[in-house]
Amino acid sequence: YVGGACVKDSTIINGKKIDFAQGATVLGMMPNFIYKETGLSKKIKTFCPENPKLIYFENDNTPTRIFREITLLEKELKDRWNEKGDVKAFRNDENKVIEFIQKIYKEGTPPNLDQAVNEIGKDLTKLWIKGSAKDLLDHYFTSEKTKVYMGMTVIESSPSSYNEKGTSFTIPLMDSGSVFGGYWGFVKQGIWKISDELLELNNELGIETILNSEINDIDTNKGRISYTNNNLDSKIYYDYLLFCTDPLTPT
């Protein structure tokens, strides 16, 4: 199967073939211009819940609601978690960083710190890109529960510690998708439909996709990859080599 982090597998339950996700299950990080310009928006059906997310901590009898509307969110976090920090400033500053990320996505330019300083300023670059997630969350929030919730993407998307430099960037990065305006949603039948449709688009463009292969060697001097495909040893030459997520890591 194709898919990278969104690869699927299948099993038989009560005589019926069932597809299931081996890695990611929700759609969120894709830029909207890719979603539209590739034609994916016309080929798949999606759904993004607009109701507040419900958060439970240990011994909670009722959930804390994560509202999209900032005034409601501020009140909820204050009432439930005794948050005394600046929730509004956090969201506003995060949006500035997200807009920068989305801009360089669209331009197809690799991000760099000098560009970040020019676009969002020295202070936000230090706090939101170069700094640690812990320092970022301590800067805006007082409640440990708020910090745990707002920093969840750091621990779910990498093995890095909150204390490591550069981990603050994970938070806006994981909210930078624009298909659902920074939120996460679902693809009818499963997120692998995205990969399936992209494979069809690639086939229409004449791109060859080689699956079920194991890379044995990469000769960067000769631009050559040696691999085994269906028990046959083969070689392929390249001008540019791009590495994407393998199917096993996210599982």
Which residue ranges define each predicted feature?
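Helical element adjacent to the flavin cofactor pocket in flavoenzyme catalytic cores
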Residues: W128, L173-K222, L232
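Short, well-ordered coil/turn residues at beta-beta hairpins
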Residues: H139, C244-T245
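Short glycine-rich, flexible loops that bind phosphorylated cofactors or substrates
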Residues: T249-T251
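Core beta-strand elements of the Rossmann-like FAD/NAD(P) dinucleotide-binding domain
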Residues: T228-Y240, C244
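N-terminal glycine-rich phosphate/pyrophosphate-binding loop and immediately adjacent elements
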Residues: Y1-F100
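A short, glycine/Asx- and small/polar-enriched loop/turn
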Residues: N59-D60, S160-G166, D219-I225, I236
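Rossmann-like flavin
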Residues: D60-K165
